[in-house]
UniProtKB/Swiss-Prot annotation:
Pfam families: Intron_maturas2 (PF01348), MatK_N (PF01824). It comes from Wisteria frutescens. This is Maturase K. One of its GO terms (molecular function) is RNA binding. It is found in: Plastid, Chloroplast. One of its GO terms (biological process) is RNA splicing. One of its GO terms (cellular component) is chloroplast. The lineage of its organism: Eukaryota, Viridiplantae, Streptophyta, Embryophyta, Tracheophyta. The keyword Cell wall biogenesis/degradation does not apply. Usually encoded in the trnK tRNA gene intron. Probably assists in splicing its own and other chloroplast group II introns.
């Protein structure tokens, strides 16, 4: 961390626009390489596949110093990537290095803000996805209405660049950034503008996630300002940024918005009981007051996206429902507020009264149908939930096959242990268990019954149901009453940093 600060201070002292010169400094690429392979607790590069080595980076820098280093002729695209260089691969390496360099100053800004707030030690737990659900349990039981919001994607990459211009005042830096986008659009000239941003996010995940995070931060900073101005109470918010928890809490240091720009708007929002939660591109807004106010927030979001960010959004992308009657889908769970009614008899002198007590409780359930759909997509079962053999794994050893299935089952059980009802989770485990048995039987060219009778693997496959109990017994007292209570209650883990493909089925 101190090395980054030293190098940044050195270049900042030379000139104000320091980001562009950083890109052409060899020591920065060495730091970026080290930074990527020795990640601190603040950095999550989910889905990023680093295919470069330090030797490739050094050769790249040598070419970048040469004249016309960014001009690549069309004939170069046919070169052997081992003898010469491939145009697409060359651009990919520059794009990845460019994104790493851009992240450095914002990473320093984040770490310094966390140190000032003295929350560095507890930051590891705050990063967990499951830490959102205790927040929902504490706050949402007192609320009545929930708004399910899906943040729209910009239809053009230039919108993301324009948002970044509020923070970075470096013309050369933006020329190079637009070069990447222009090179991408020319390389994919047959792709429509609507699909271009989706394709860019897959081919340049690191750079796209950085730009997208800035877009979401800008939108949330304005929302946060309006919320704080419309109430004297402190905003209760919790957000985990899109695939990169790297940007957690950066909304504290975003563009300052002045009250005079929203003087007429603030009169519409007077809601002291409002809570906001977001993960990736989906957010939840909950309120205690009437749905009229929720509709005002809905139209505010639509106009904000259309007028300020030039992003078209249909009113149908925001759904407003009553918590006691509808469930909302968030982070792989179905959640709603359940009303538990009980009648208490009270007697005063000779008069007897029946008092009805209503207790609200947040009910969090495993969504069985989307999970079966995800398992069917991965070829573990059909769309009806009947287990299938994973024939593509039949070439592996028996131990590897069982270990793969156990790992999937362990991850799902680990993630969905916060469910109020474990019945659906046990059904998913049962599907994976039978799929594992069918895969082993397929490998040995036998039927399921004959394979189990011959190998006696039935006891081994009981790990699908008993492994979680063994882990919990190491943490809690090993008594039947304790284990039964753990099966009924929710268990949230603070070491889950992102959801896997089977969970992320939204």
């Amino acid at each position: 961390m101190k090395e980054y600060q030293v190098y940044l201070e050195r270049d900042r002292s030379r000139q104000q626009d320091f980001l562009y010169p950083l890109i052409f400094r060899e020591y920065i690429y060495g730091l970026a390489y080290s930074h990527d392979f020795n990640r601190s607790i603040f950095v999550e590069n989910v889905g990023y596949d680093n295919k470069s080595s330090l030797l490739i980076v050094k050769r790249l820098i040598t070419r970048m110093y040469q004249q016309n280093h960014l001009i690549i002729s069309a004939n170069d695209s046919n070169k052997n990537p081992f003898l010469g260089y491939n145009k697409n691969f060359y651009s990919q390496i520059i794009s990845d290095g460019f994104a790493v360099v851009v992240e450095i100053p914002f990473f320093l800004q984040l770490s310094s803000s966390l140190e000032e707030a003295e929350i560095v030690k507890s930051y590891h737990n705050l990063r967990s996805i499951h830490s959102i659900f205790p927040f929902l349990e504490d706050k949402f039981t007192y609320l009545n209405y929930v708004s399910d919001i899906r943040i729209p994607y910009p239809i053009h990459l230039e919108i993301l660049v324009q948002i970044l211009r509020y923070w970075v005042k470096d013309a050369s830096f933006f020329h190079l950034l637009r070069f990447f986008l222009y090179h991408f659009s020319n390389r994919n000239s047959l792709i429509t503008p609507k699909k271009s941003i989706s394709t860019f996010s897959k081919s340049n995940p690191r750079l796209f996630l950085f730009l997208y995070n800035f877009y979401v931060c800008e939108y949330e900073s304005i929302f946060r300002f309006l919320r704080n101005q419309s109430s004297h109470l402190r905003l209760k918010s919790f957000s985990v940024f899109f695939e990169r928890i790297f940007f957690y809490a950066k909304r504290e240091h975003l563009v300052k918005v002045f009250p005079k720009d929203f003087s007429s708007t603030l009169t519409f929002f007077k809601d002291p009981f409002i809570h906001y939660v977001r993960y990736q591109g989906k957010s939840i807004l909950a309120s205690k007051n009437a749905p009229l106010l929720m509709n005002k927030w809905k139209h505010y979001f639509i106009h904000l996206w259309q007028c300020f960010f030039d992003v078209w959004s249909q009113p149908g992308t925001i759904h407003i429902n009553q918590l006691s009657e509808h469930s909302f889908h968030f982070l792989g769970y179905f959640s709603n507020v359940r009303l538990n009614r009980s009648v208490v008899r009270s007697q005063m002198l000779q008069n007897t009264f029946l008092i009805e007590i209503v207790i609200k409780k947040l009910d969090i359930i495993v969504p069985i149908i989307p999970l079966i759909r995800s398992l069917a997509k991965a070829k573990f079962c059909n769309v009806l939930g009947h287990p299938l053999s994973k024939s593509v794994w039949a070439d592996s050893s028996d131990f590897d096959i069982i270990d793969r299935f156990l790992r999937i089952c362990r991850n799902l059980s680990h993630y969905y242990n916060g469910s109020s009802k474990k019945k659906n989770l046990y059904r998913i485990k049962y599907i994976l268990r039978l799929s594992c048995i069918k895969t082993l039987a397929c490998k040995h060219k036998s039927t399921v019954r004959a394979f189990l009778k011959k190998s006696g693997s039935e006891e081994l496959l009981e790990e699908f149901f008993t492994e979680e109990e063994e882990i919990l017994s190491l943490i809690f007292p090993r008594t039947s009453s304790t284990l039964q209570r753990l099966h009924r209650n929710r268990i949230w883990y603070l070491d889950i940093l992102f959801s896997n493909d089977l969970v992320n089925h939204e």
